[in-house]
Curated annotation (Swiss-Prot):
Toxic segment of the protein is located in the N-terminus. Transmembrane segments: none annotated. This is Pesticidal crystal protein Cry25Aa. GO terms for biological process: sporulation resulting in formation of a cellular spore; symbiont-mediated killing of host cell. Promotes colloidosmotic lysis by binding to the midgut epithelial cells of insects. InterPro entries: Galactose-bd-like_sf, Pest_crys, Pest_crys_dom-III, Pest_crys_dom_I, Pest_crys_N_sf, Pest_cryst_cen_dom_sf, Pest_cryst_dom_II. Belongs to the delta endotoxin family. Keywords: Sporulation, Toxin, Virulence. GO terms for molecular function: signaling receptor binding; toxin activity. It holds the Pfam family Endotoxin_N. SUPFAM superfamilies: delta-Endotoxin (insectocide), middle domain, delta-Endotoxin (insectocide), N-terminal domain, Galactose-binding domain-like.
């Protein structure tokens, strides 16, 4: 039995190793349980046909679907929604799906024997369902919808019947596949990218059913028994499925992390752990975090949402043909602590200073040895952060993004790295990461510095490109962190030799997370709780919230947020908003909201979790704050807690009775606050 079963990522990181039945980590040549026999690690990697190296692996197509899903949540019209939903399906060409690549990527990290028949069944089923979804279901729904008029909301009867029938059939088929081919026993981890995408589509179909149930004459999902307590059987099915799908994705994501973590405590294990964490965040967890926005009972009008999590790419620069030797000698915890940041409020890079120094016997070649980051938080306060590298002396380059106030701060970099063996050092081999060129650009300007290592035998480290400059405006990520480490380790193959190197790690925010808390006059605005204006304790999120959580405990009982309108002259003090909090509570608590001294009544928050280790999807509840709020030109809200412990996911600002909304939409907004 896997001792990491049902453990969170934090527990897995801190857990003791499981050395029972652990296969050899390298080169897997003699282990009877290894995926490949009589070969080395590089050969085994090459078995995953079609995998090409990139900064985010081969999962860029799937990450693009997250953008479409976010855009769908913010879509103000049904017509736009049809176009966006249709575009999601277009990411899967008829002749080749991206899923075999992602399956191979996942399997390359967890190192389990692939059941190719299960993979073929799942990918074939998904491609078939997506074809039906796009060419039959969406077409029938659009054709019927276009015939509806206020006097006849049911539209053309024949088109209505075709739309009803195709909705019932595609909903049933996705539901069955998610319980069957997409979750086949023994392949759940490698199938997670397929499962998460299929679950996203199924929830969108249930959203359509909830929205058009009366006009289409829908009764209940096909094959689902009627329950007398369910006013809307499709809403009941939606709530059941969102919990089931979220729990499935998080459970098998944690299992995948556990399988990698149990291999050992060396750097190779960390490298693969971080890669699995990053790429599953991009293709699974990001989507899971967006599932709740499909609930039209909670989000009846367009919703602006943000993903505040950070992903860390592989350290820039390979380490020649000794990469495996180096990382087998490094410690997992050392790399985790120095190549990723501890939990803190949301922030962004303001400037970066790069430090270089000359290495002896290197013909005066410069190497990157450290960096110093100046970061800015939502409230305008700044802090300096450095990695494990050298940050003394005069920096050779400074990239400053401290332009303007309130503008999106997006940083784009193009980095080329290489390494070199330095001759002439007794009992020592040095491979130092050098930067051929470093460029960073933002709307406020760009920094550029180029320097090279001296001549000599060069190990092939390839080229790492991050958001090419010509495409930066369409980027879905921006640099939020930069960390450098310097280490010297003894070679496993020859303990008398020392191996020295430096490496650069980059952290990335999703572009949906802006640097200010901007509320929108005609949408529900979701503000991540980590975007507080004050330094405040944060804890690791459970995986399905799109970021970390703000911890309101006995030692820190106030969260403060400065707000800004997206378009000031459209708003007056007469426009009302309401506030809703999504949070989990350990013990019964109360919460109130203060807006420049005007406090709301206290609201009791029921206990939903016994401890941090027991947080589940159902642990999070929506707490509606009574009364309307009228924001002036510089609104500020504070969350105040009484005894108990609140873990806050996000704050939601909901417009009330704003003129672009239809009468029905205004009624839907009002219903959000009726207990």
């Amino acid at each position: 039995m896997n001792p990491y079963q049902n453990k969170s990522e934090c527990e897995i990181l801190n857990a003791p190793l499981n050395n029972i039945n652990m296969p050899n980590r390298y080169p897997f040549a003699n282990d009877p349980n290894a995926v490949m026999k009589n070969g080395n690690y590089k050969d085994w990697l090459n078995e995953c046909d079609g995998i090409t190296p990139s900064i985010f692996g081969t999962l860029g197509v799937l990450a693009s679907i997250v953008i479409s899903t976010i855009n769908l949540a913010t879509s103000p019209s049904i017509g736009d929604a049809f176009a966006l939903v249709s575009s999601i399906g277009e990411y899967w060409p008829e002749t080749k799906t991206s899923f075999p690549l992602s399956v191979a990527d996942v399997n390359r990290l967890i190192r389990e024997a692939l059941d190719q028949n299960a993979i073929n069944r799942a990918t074939g089923k998904f491609n078939g369902l997506m074809d039906t979804y796009n060419t039959v279901y969406l077409k029938n729904l659009q054709d019927w919808y276009d015939t509806r008029i206020p006097a006849n909301p049911q539209g053309d009867s024949q088109l209505r019947e075709a739309a009803r029938r195709s909705l019932e059939e595609i909903e049933r088929d996705f539901r069955k596949a998610l319980a069957g081919e997409f979750a086949e026993a023994g392949s759940q981890i490698v199938l997670l990218p397929i499962y998460a995408q299929a679950a996203n589509i199924h929830l969108l179909i249930l959203k359509d059913a909830m929205q058009f149930r009366t006009d289409l004459g829908l009764i209940r999902p096909v094959g689902v028994p009627i329950t007398t307590s369910a006013e809307d059987p499709f809403e009941s099915e939606f709530l059941l499925r969102i919990k089931k799908y979220t729990d499935h994705c998080i459970s098998y994501y944690d299992d995948g992390l556990a399988k990698i973590r149990s291999r050992g405590s060396d750097g190779e294990t960390w490298w693969e752990f971080n890669k699995f964490r990053r790429e599953m965040t991009l293709t699974v967890l990001d989507l899971v975090a967006l599932y709740p926005t499909h609930n039209i009972k909670l989000y009846p009008i367009p919703t602006q949402t943000e993903l505040s999590r950070v992903v860390y790419t592989d350290p820039v620069g390979c380490f020649g043909n000794r990469k495996s030797d180096i990382f087998s000698r490094l410690n997992f915890d050392y790399l985790e602590n120095r190549l990723t940041r501890p939990r803190e409020p949301f922030n962004y890079l303001n400037s970066v200073q790069l430090f270089a120094s000359t290495v002896s016997n290197s013909n005066n070649g410069e190497v990157l040895r450290g960096n110093l980051n100046k970061i800015m938080f939502e409230g305008g306060w700044t802090a300096s952060r450095s990695g494990d590298g050298v940050t003394t002396g005069t920096p050779f380059s400074t990239m400053d993004w401290s332009y303007g106030w309130g503008y999106p701060r997006k940083h784009y970099a193009e980095i080329t790295s290489r390494s070199q063996a330095l001759p002439g050092l007794n009992n020592s081999i040095h491979v130092i990461v050098g930067i051929d060129s470093f460029r960073a650009i933002g709307p406020g300007g760009q920094g550029d510095h180029t320097f090279s290592l001296p001549g000599g035998d060069m190990y092939d480290c390839g080229k790492v490109q991050i958001n090419p400059l010509e495409d930066y405006r369409n980027s879905d990520h921006w640099i939020s962190d930069m960390m450098t480490i310097n280490q010297s380790v003894q070679l496993a193959s020859n303990p008398t030799q020392t191996f020295a190197f430096s490496a650069l790690s980059l952290g990335w925010h999703h572009s949906s997370a802006g640097n200010r808390n901007v509320y929108v006059y005609d949408k529900i605005t979701q503000i991540p709780a980590t975007k507080t204006v004050r330094e405040h304790p944060m804890i690791k999120g459970p995986g399905f919230t799109g970021g970390d959580l703000a911890d309101l405990s006995s030692n820190s009982d106030i969260l403060q947020y400065d707000l800004r309108s997206d378009y000031d002259d459209r708003l007056t003090e007469d426009v009302p908003f309401r506030i809703r909090i999504r949070c989990a509570s350990i013990g019964v608590s109360t919460i109130s909201v203060d807006n420049w001294g005007s406090s709301s009544p206290q609201v009791t928050v029921a206990s939903t979790a016994a401890s941090l280790d027991t947080l589940k999807y159902e642990s999070f509840q929506y707490v509606s704050i009574p009364g309307n709020y009228y924001f002036d030109s510089a609104p500020r809200i504070r969350l105040l807690r009484q005894p108990g412990r609140l873990l806050v996911d996000r704050i939601e600002i909901i417009p009330v009775n704003f003129f672009p909304l239809s009468e029905q939409e205004n009624k839907s907004v009002d219903s959000l606050f009726i207990n």
